[in-house]
UniProtKB/Swiss-Prot annotation:
GO terms for cellular component: Golgi membrane. The lineage of its organism: Eukaryota, Metazoa, Chordata, Craniata, Vertebrata. It comes from Xenopus laevis (African clawed frog). The gene is manea. This is Glycoprotein endo-alpha-1,2-mannosidase. The keyword Transmembrane applies. The chain crosses the membrane at residues 9-29. Residues 59-449 are annotated as: Catalytic.
Length: 449
């Protein structure tokens, strides 16, 4: 009996020792090439409630079970632990880091149909090339108009739980300003529906996370100096008093709202001068509706048009290095010099990569591989070299063009396999953004010395 008890004690001791050894090993594990280690394990970033969104789409889970294989090498984050973060656990928001945000997505639960996820395949303008590629529309939830698949599934931009998840992701990345894609009330892009009605929800939720919001005004039919003046008056009157409404402090001490004007070059400089110069017929300068107006620079010649048009500066938007003069990193130094000489604000735009072959199957030459985050880091580093006052990110969720930093998951169906962020976790680009945001803030302190 004594011998049996001794044997039992020895066996139990060995078992306990092995358990302790395994626990100690697990405690010190982390990905070899992770900049900060696992963001989930460190508790740095909030998790993302994919289930809370997908459960609202009745057909989605059935499709996932029957027709798809979801592949992932990552473990699911412990939802309760990761999601329940106090505000002080987020990194400080960097209000000099802006991110382009799109509100045009819809699904049957919230919008009565899929919007934008079922994007059509766009036809090439050259008939000879167009004949070599298919036409048609995507068929969500498994077939969406994107080369990557969102962790939240084909969501609705007006879903309160999605807005909350997005604000958490953005705040976790240390970005401070959301540049929301905007059309006037009752107007939308060709594949969307009007979205101005839920801007208040975005402002409210952004404020709850300490974020600011400005407006990225999209091109619409007959946009000109007169209509844009009406847009600015509407935005400032309706949203200007909201605590989340972003205002930029100028060198002379004024605080003014900032507007990005997408595709500004399609309108003549003379027309813009009517609105943006002090002597213009529609001038808003030195009125309650004055602001910082950022033009889009694509070609080199646009910088002179932008100056004549009365803009306060320009941004480059495209996340495709080499695609345009403005998006090419090698030109940022000369563009910044031009802005310094002419008292303009230069905002370079950086992005994690580019791929839009899900909607433009013929446009493979403009694909920019993410290279596991290296492309993104190279772009941000190039931006920092010119010491910009603001950097913009293209984008949080432009899924059609594959520029998103929003969380994405591996997924494949019987017909296709989506691109993914492996070997990294779904939030790797949020983590990289945080890393570089902190570097940006530290470097700016030295620039000001």
């Amino acid at each position: 009996m004594i011998r049996f008890r001794r044997r039992t004690c020895i066996t139990l001791s060995i078992f306990i020792f092995l358990v302790c050894l395994i626990m100690a090993g697990l405690k010190h594990l982390r990905p070899e090439n992770a900049a900060f280690g696992s963001p989930f394990g460190l508790g740095l970033f909030p998790g993302f409630h994919r289930a809370s969104v997908l459960e609202k789409i009745p057909d989605s889970e059935n499709h996932l079970k029957g027709n798809t294989v979801t592949e992932t090498n990552t473990l699911p984050a412990p939802k309760d632990k990761v999601y329940q973060l106090d505000m002080e656990e987020f990194p400080p928001p960097n209000y000099d880091l802006h991110i382009f945000y799109y509100t045009w997505y819809g699904n049957p639960q919230f919008d009565g149909k899929y919007i934008h996820w079922n994007h059509p395949l766009l036809k090439h303008w050259d008939a000879k090339i167009a004949n070599s590629f298919p036409l048609g529309k995507h068929n969500p939830p498994d077939d969406v108009g994107a080369n990557f698949y969102p962790e939240l599934g084909p969501y609705s931009s007006r879903d309160p739980s999605v807005i909350d998840a997005h604000m958490k992701q953005i705040r976790s990345s240390s970005v401070g300003v959301i540049s929301v894609s905007w059309y006037p009330p009752g107007i939308s892009d060709d594949n969307g529906e009007p979205t101005d009605d839920f801007i208040p929800s975005i402002l409210d939720k952004a404020h709850s996370y300490g974020l600011k919001v400005n407006f990225h005004i999209e091109p619409y039919r007959n946009r000109d100096d007169y209509s844009l003046r009406n847009n600015v008056v509407y935005i400032i009157d309706k949203y200007g008093s909201h605590p989340a409404f972003y205002k930029y402090k100028t060198d002379n001490g004024r605080t003014l709202p900032m507007f990005y004007i997408y595709d500004s070059y399609i309108t003549t400089p003379g027309t813009w001068a009517n609105l943006l110069t002090s002597s213009g017929s529609q001038s808003i300068r030195n009125t309650p509706y004055d602001g910082i107006f950022m033009a889009l620079l694509v070609e080199e010649k646009h910088k002179h048009d932008i100056l004549r048009g009365g803009f306060d500066g320009f941004y480059t938007y495209f996340a495709t290095n080499g695609f345009s003069y403005g998006s090419s990193h090698q030109h940022w130094s000369s563009l910044k010099e031009f802005c310094n000489t002419n008292n303009l604000l230069f905002i370079p735009s950086v992005g994690p990569g580019y791929i839009d072959t899900s909607i433009r199957p013929w446009n493979f030459q403009n694909t920019r591989n993410r290279i596991n985050g290296k492309y993104y880091e190279t772009a941000i580093n190039a931006a920092l070299l010119v010491r910009p006052k603001i950097i913009s990110i293209t984008s949080f969720n432009e899924w059609h063009e594959g520029t998103q930093i929003e969380a994405a998951i591996p997924k494949k169906t019987a017909q296709m396999k989506y691109e993914d962020y492996l070997p990294h976790k779904p939030n790797i680009y949020l983590e990289l953004t945080r890393k570089w945001s902190e570097k940006y803030m530290k470097e700016k302190e030295h620039w000001l010395v």
